[in-house]
Regions:
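ATP/nucleoside-binding phosphotransfer catalytic cores, i.e., glycine-rich phosphate-binding loops
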Residues: 2-12, 25, 230-326
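N-terminal glycine-/serine-/threonine-rich phosphate-binding loop
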Residues: 2-70, 364-365, 372
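Ligand-binding beta-strand-loop-alpha-helix segment within the catalytic cores
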Residues: 21-35, 95-168
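Glycine-rich N-terminal segment of FAD-binding domains in flavoprotein oxidoreductases
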Residues: 61-92
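Active-site beta-strand->loop->alpha-helix modules in alpha/beta enzyme cores, enriched
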Residues: 145-146, 308-385, 389-568, 574, ...
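Short, surface-exposed, charged loop/turn segments at secondary-structure junctions
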Residues: 154, 175-197, 249-252, 546-555, ...
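Class I SAM-dependent methyltransferase SAM-binding "motif I" and its flanking Rossmann-like core
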Residues: 177-223
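A conserved mid-domain beta-alpha-beta active-site/ligand-binding segment of alpha/beta enzyme cores
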Residues: 580-636
Length: 661
């Protein structure tokens, strides 16, 4: 069973010479916008092996030279695979940790019994699995009183100095551009100190340590301490890190992105995979730094970029514009700027359709979806019980109105995203109507009292009882059914899959299993769809979206292995959610909406009342989900309009997934 197919999706085929130049001259040209040495690996696995090579080499050199190697280690999620690789090297006798001295980069403070500890995590991940001597492991003393905190920090720095300073720092570039717990605003010369854990970093802590409530403060080595090391290796993996990697590597060093201070270090290296590097100039806009290897997507991206730079629509771009912005080779390749303009304009125009299921009895040569068969059987997979309407509510309504047989499959219950107050309101209503509806039974009254007592005694971070989770899940089911009914989806076509991996009761979910994939596979087999819509949030901050997508892709893969001929005729479209939209160079289908259709979509999203103002996982975006969706859809329409195409109120965009075989 292939459970990680989403990680193998490559929207771009990036020429190897862009990310792995063959010589120093080529590197100097390609990387002239980069202010710190940056190594791009095709995959995270390749980057992990490269980092492990450097760590092993550093250990051997320093042990041979002075009898020990002093390393500061972080415990962010990005570093974990490096530790796994180092353990493998140790077991294969490729490295010896007997003379390695370890300093903990950061530690939560103050601490209580049972509270999370980064040192415990580091011990579980690496230290206990190799031959590092206990006396060679150093961490901040969490028992220091707050009044003695300054002296405690200085004492920790003195321990580092007594060991001869740090030979190596191994850490991740955090989601906020942080190094260790040095959040935005940290000074270049900052020392070891107590720091507040900001809201963005706190969410990554919740995920890494499987917590409901993150510690508010921590002790961290400062930027100055990190830059004092002889070598710094920093890493970042995945598309969700692309924006911060660009800021750290190419933008001016700034306190707003502490990782950008790596630019000031003479022996710092940033190691990223292609996904995390996608906004670097040599990957995103290679025509600015080298002779470009043009393909249709790259051409579309370049012309959209040129329109943004000039403020002109596609068909008004001139040869002078191409020359001024370094795209003269593209114009020369096609004979003239006009020829490029026409090609790209037609290419993008053909993505627009008001018939997402295909227009019956029409020439479909230049349409994103085929005309036949009609009507089509369609499955829309929704990770949570509102992602369908948030991400593609306008498209879903069109599919229903155009008489396709539309099924909606809610992959998870979404129960942990219902607030206690919302759930308690339903209990109060049932208490008031129980006599009239014959619910005044001993069992109901017992359950009602148990729930009220549980809520009264509940503390932040406590896991909900099974009864609470069941009730919250039923609330989300009812909201989803209401929304589907509002759109005209048949009741029998609404499927609640309740995939087992989700049902842990905590933020941290289980691993995708054969049970999950079988549930999805059985549904697909029973419907035999001509179209499948699936979440394409490959940088999903929740994680659930990606796991749900992997479940669908694994099921499709198994069906193809089983020889399901009808599956070969099924087209799979990926949508994106409330966080980001597909880039213009990737969009293959764009479904427009009028003001009335956008208003209908908003009203459909509002059927999910538990996900409004008091929803637990709104993140640090102050906008509600319907506002995020509208802003995103309007921005897509505005982009099309700015390129000189038809002007719509809003648009939903899709990319076709071709099964990886």
């Amino acid at each position: 069973m292939k459970t990680n197919l989403s990680s193998q999706i490559k929207l771009d085929l990036v020429p190897k010479r862009y990310y792995a130049p063959e010589n120093k001259i080529e590197y100097a040209s390609l990387c002239r916008e980069e202010k710190v040495f940056t190594q791009i690996s095709e995959t995270a696995d390749g980057g992990v092996k490269s980092l492990a090579d450097e760590v092993v080499e550093t250990i051997k050199k320093n042990v041979e030279k002075k009898g020990k190697c002093v390393i500061a280690l972080g415990t962010g999620n990005s570093v974990l695979p490096v530790y796994t690789e180092l353990i493998s090297r140790y077991e294969n006798k490729e490295v010896d940790f007997a003379d390695v001295v370890v300093f903990n980069l950061f530690e939560f403070y103050p601490t209580e019994a049972g509270a999370p500890s980064t040192l415990d995590r580091l011990n579980n991940l690496l230290l206990s699995k190799v031959n590092i001597k206990p006396e060679n492991v150093h961490s901040f003393n969490q028992e220091v009183e707050k009044v003695d905190l300054y002296e405690g920090c200085r004492a920790y720095e003195a321990e580092i100095d007594a060991c001869g300073g740090l030979d190596l720092v191994l850490c991740e570039i955090g989601v906020a551009g942080n190094l260790a717990f040095n959040a935005p605003g940290s000074q270049f010369s900052s020392a070891c100190r107590m720091t507040l854990i900001d809201s963005v970093i706190r969410r990554s802590v919740l995920s890494a340590y499987d917590l409901e409530v993150a510690p508010a403060t921590a002790i961290t080595l400062g930027i100055g301490n990190i830059l004092a090391a002889k070598k710094v290796l920093a890493m970042a993996w995945g598309e969700n890190q692309a924006k911060i990697v660009k800021a750290a590597v190419e933008d001016k060093a700034s306190e707003t992105v502490p990782a950008s201070f790596l630019q000031m270090h003479r022996n710092a290296k940033v190691v990223v995979d292609l996904s995390a590097a996608e906004r670097l100039t040599r990957i995103c806009h290679p025509w600015l730094v080298t002779l470009c290897e043009w393909n249709n997507k790259m051409i579309r991206r370049a012309i959209a970029w040129l329109c943004e730079k000039t403020g002109k629509p596609i068909l008004k771009l001139t040869s002078n514009d191409y020359n001024e912005y370094g795209l003269n080779e593209l114009a020369a390749q096609f004979g003239s700027a006009y020829n490029v303009n026409i090609k790209v304009f037609n290419d993008i125009q053909h993505t627009i359709t008001g018939w997402p299921g295909g227009k019956p009895d029409a020439d479909d040569t230049d349409r994103p979806e085929r005309a036949k068969p009609y009507p089509k059987r369609v499955i829309v997979f929704s990770p949570h019980p509102d992602d369908d309407v948030i991400s593609m509510g306008g498209t879903l309504k069109r599919l229903v109105d155009q008489k396709h047989d539309v099924h909606v499959a809610y992959e998870t219950s979404g129960n942990i995203a219902v607030g206690d107050e919302d759930m308690f309101r339903y209990i109060l209503v049932m208490d008031q109507i129980k006599k009239e509806f014959g619910l005044d039974t001993e069992l109901y009254n017992q359950k009602s009292e148990e729930i009220k007592k549980f809520l009264a005694a509940k503390h932040p971070g406590d896991v909900d009882s099974l009864d609470l989770r069941m009730l919250k899940g039923r609330i989300r089911r009812a909201e989803a059914k209401t929304a589907c009914n509002w759109m005209g989806v048949k009741p029998e076509n609404v499927h609640h899959l309740d995939l087992p991996f989700y049902e842990t009761g905590t933020i941290k979910k289980g691993d995708l299993s054969e049970r999950d994939v079988k549930i999805v596979k059985d549904l697909i087999s029973s419907v035999k769809p001509h179209q499948i819509f699936v979440a394409g949030d490959l940088a999903d901050p929740h994680g659930t979206h990606r796991v749900c997508t992997d479940a669908v892709l694994a099921a499709i893969d198994e069906l193809l292995d089983d020889g399901a001929e009808w599956m070969k005729e099924c087209r799979i479209w990926m949508y994106r959610g409330a966080w980001a939209e597909w880039e213009i160079d990737h969009i293959e289908m764009a479904v427009p909406m009028s003001p009335e259709q956008l208003r209908f979509k908003r009203n459909t999203i509002l059927k999910h009342q538990s996900q409004m103002e008091n929803a637990p996982f709104l993140g640090d975006d102050d906008r509600l989900f319907w506002q995020r969706a509208e802003d995103r859809n309007r921005a897509t329409a505005q982009l099309y309009s700015s390129l000189g195409l038809a002007s719509y109120e809003a648009m939903e965009a899709f990319v076709e997934y071709h099964p990886i075989r």
